[in-house]
Amino acid sequence: MTNIRKSHPLLKIINDSFIDLPTPSNISSWWNFGSLLGICLVLQISTGLFLAMHYTSDTATAFNSVTHISRDVNYGWVLRYLHANGASMFFICLYLHVGRGLYYGSYLYKETWNVGVILLFATMATAFMGYVLPWGQMSFWGATVITNLLSAIPYIGTDLVEWIWGGFSVDKATLT
């Protein structure tokens, strides 16, 4: 006599996905960070889009628009806090995910590890682009902190920083 969860078509899908999932015996909570990264990324994109609908980057009105988001937009303060803390949580999960890979020796799988390194560099490049380039909404402080190390290169450092910034667009409290 077979169990209904293994013979019924719909229950068989659930059984194979959740109950009899073919996973290694050493799986632990360390293996959740890839999924948590996806959740954090969806959270960042969705809250960022809603915040961008109400934010103005002009130096005279930027603070007022943030105040408007916090006071007048329904649950705007929640969006701000989720977006700010979601960014920190994203990078915590990212570093823990890399740390788990180092701990369990995943670097021995060269192709998989190289894809992960490329994704890490792409994440850092995307974070830079998100800070500096779109809509002129990032602060002068953020752009200078991220590119500060490049300015220490002799002879070409300042020109390299200006080239990465995209010219002289970085000169005020916000990039407009």
Curated annotation (Swiss-Prot):
The gene is MT-CYB. Gene3D superfamilies: Cytochrome Bc1 Complex, Chain C. Keywords: Electron transport, Heme, Iron, Membrane, Metal-binding, Mitochondrion, Mitochondrion inner membrane, Respiratory chain, Transmembrane, Transmembrane helix, Transport, Ubiquinone. Its cofactor is heme b. This is Cytochrome b. Its main location: mitochondrion. It is a multi-pass membrane protein. Pfam families: Cytochrome_B (PF00033). Belongs to the cytochrome b family. One of its GO terms (molecular function) is ubiquinol-cytochrome-c reductase activity. GO terms for cellular component: mitochondrial inner membrane. Binds 2 heme b groups non-covalently. Component of the ubiquinol-cytochrome c reductase complex (complex III or cytochrome b-c1 complex) that is part of the mitochondrial respiratory chain. The b-c1 complex mediates electron transfer from ubiquinol to cytochrome c. Contributes to the generation of a proton gradient across the mitochondrial membrane that is then used for ATP synthesis. Heme 1 (or BL or b562) is low-potential and absorbs at about 562 nm, and heme 2 (or BH or b566) is high-potential and absorbs at about 566 nm. Heme b b562 binds at H83. The keyword Transmembrane helix applies. The cytochrome bc1 complex contains 11 subunits: 3 respiratory subunits (MT-CYB, CYC1 and UQCRFS1), 2 core proteins (UQCRC1 and UQCRC2) and 6 low-molecular weight proteins (UQCRH/QCR6, UQCRB/QCR7, UQCRQ/QCR8, UQCR10/QCR9, UQCR11/QCR10 and a cleavage product of UQCRFS1). This cytochrome bc1 complex then forms a dimer.
